[in-house]
Amino acid sequence: MSPKTETKASVGFKAGVKDYRLTYYTPEYQTKDTDILAAFRVTPQPGVPPEEAGAAVAAESSTGTWTTVWTDGLTSLDRYKGRCYDIEAVPGEESQFIAYVAYPLDLFEEGSVTNLFTSIVGNVFGFKALRALRLEDLRIPPAYSKTFQGPPHGIQVERDKLNKYGRPLLGCTIKPKLGLSAKNYGRAVYECLRGGLDFTKDDENVNSQPFMRWRDRFVFCAEALYKAQAETGEIKGHYLNATAGTCEEMMKRAVFARELGVPIVMHDYLTGGFTANTSLAHYCRDNGLLLHIHRAMHAVIDRQRNHGMHFRVLAKALRMSGGDHIHAGTVVGKLEGERDVTLGFVDLLRDDFIEKDRSRGIYFTQDWVSMPGVLPVASGGIHVWHMPALTEIFGDDSVLQFGGGTLGHPWGNAPGAVANRVALEACVQARNEGRDLAREGNEVIREATKWSPELAAACEVWKEIKFEFDTIDYL
């Protein structure tokens, strides 16, 4: 045996494989205020003990690998390793449990959601000892969240920019989402904004296709919103989608939007990536642009109960990366979203301090300190009959977005916008008068139809439309 090898042995190095739980399962550990905490739903392979599976998650998402390495002796493993500090059973699920893992703050680069996710969810989800793994929640300590800019402006600054208070904001996604020329697209934008909406929106997959290049769309939409502003006396906006194939092209589109003087741009933050999104958010704050965020691709990640990542984690990540709006489900429309769960992550988007509440899926108390909030956007299969429920569920600090529920009006786009604006104003007035929208909502809408033929026509068209399917993701 060489002297060098003897030296390794003398400091305790022993080659081979040992159980993760011997190093990474530490039920006696007391979490620190600076730790990033994670709650994983773990489904181990048959024969793998819960402690070993939880420890494996902690190891493979922090400092561990499959075998002992002698370079462990060159650092302080106790300082840098993740620790599985608690395990609890999942009620009604014999083969699942929640593993709580604490990560030291020094494992993560400051101000980088990309690095945070690369570490915590980047590799461990393919681990063979696990049948399935889902990240249910993260606790982001102020010591880490303060390294992020967060939303470019936030809720209060947006209201001040728009001079609109005391009600939800109204939007509309232009349909058909693909195939319109830039001029016809701009026409639809103008008609919707003139009819009473606050915003119109590019759909998530409208970028720069052969039928409508981005620069043409930006110019016609800017012309449309300025014309609508002049005619209505209200500040209007259109979410110009700056998402592109490269960060450089994305920034070029955002710069052109700023030169046009429009108030807001848009980004698909999951398909575009967190690095690109954070860069765009920084540009938007520096240049006075609001930033609307679409969550295209989220259901690939978050829809299955046993594997992936819950949207509340993606919502927290977006608040750190930066966005002033984000789509958050509707509860009542065509897209997935259970009420208590949805309201849980809506609070995580908007509020400064959110208490732990397992009944709403919130595993940790979250303190955002001074980070601005994000407006949740309710969009997808909603129409005027949903307005009372949406107003009651989401409150004033939200954006209610009707695509087909505006453009599908039998009289055209502008009457569709009028119908939605009248319905919203009626619901807000009824709520302010003390009426119970959950119980009296339909009556409130019927009363408003007496004064608005546009609303009456909309109510007739969509009176039988419902999306009644069981939610997949429930508590």
From Swiss-Prot:
Known catalytic reactions: 2 (2R)-3-phosphoglycerate + 2 H(+) = D-ribulose 1,5-bisphosphate + CO2 + H2O; D-ribulose 1,5-bisphosphate + O2 = 2-phosphoglycolate + (2R)-3-phosphoglycerate + 2 H(+)
Group of enzyme by EC: lyase
InterPro entries according to UniProt: RuBisCO, RuBisCo_large_chain_AS, RuBisCO_lsu_C, RuBisCO_lsu_C_sf, RuBisCO_lsu_fd_N, RuBisCO_lsu_N_sf, RuBisCO_lsuI
Record note on cofactor: Binds 1 Mg(2+) ion per subunit.
Residues modified as N6,N6,N6-trimethyllysine: 14
Compartments, record wording: Plastid, Chloroplast
PTM notes: The disulfide bond which can form in the large chain dimeric partners within the hexadecamer appears to be associated with oxidative stress and protein turnover.
Cofactor: Mg(2+)
GO BP field: photorespiration; reductive pentose-phosphate cycle
Binding positions for Mg(2+) per the UniProt entry: 201, 203-204
Propiece residue ranges: 1-2
Active site residues according to the UniProt entry: 175 (proton acceptor), 294 (proton acceptor)
PROSITE patterns on file: RUBISCO_LARGE
Post-translational modification N6-carboxylysine, affected residues: 201
GO molecular function: magnesium ion binding; monooxygenase activity; ribulose-bisphosphate carboxylase activity
EC number: 4.1.1.39
Family annotation (Pfam families): RuBisCO_large, RuBisCO_large_N
Gene3D superfamilies assigned: Ribulose bisphosphate carboxylase, large subunit, C-terminal domain (3.20.20.110), RuBisCO large subunit, N-terminal domain (3.30.70.150)
Chain positions recorded as substrate binding sites: 123, 173, 177, 295, 327, 379
Positions bearing N-acetylproline: 3
Gene Ontology CC terms, in alphabetical order: chloroplast
Subunit field text: Heterohexadecamer of 8 large chains and 8 small chains; disulfide-linked. The disulfide link is formed within the large subunit homodimers.
Note: The basic functional RuBisCO is composed of a large chain homodimer in a 'head-to-tail' conformation. In form I RuBisCO this homodimer is arranged in a barrel-like tetramer with the small subunits forming a tetrameric 'cap' on each end of the 'barrel'.
Family: Belongs to the RuBisCO large chain family. Type I subfamily.
Name by which UniProt lists this protein: Ribulose bisphosphate carboxylase large chain
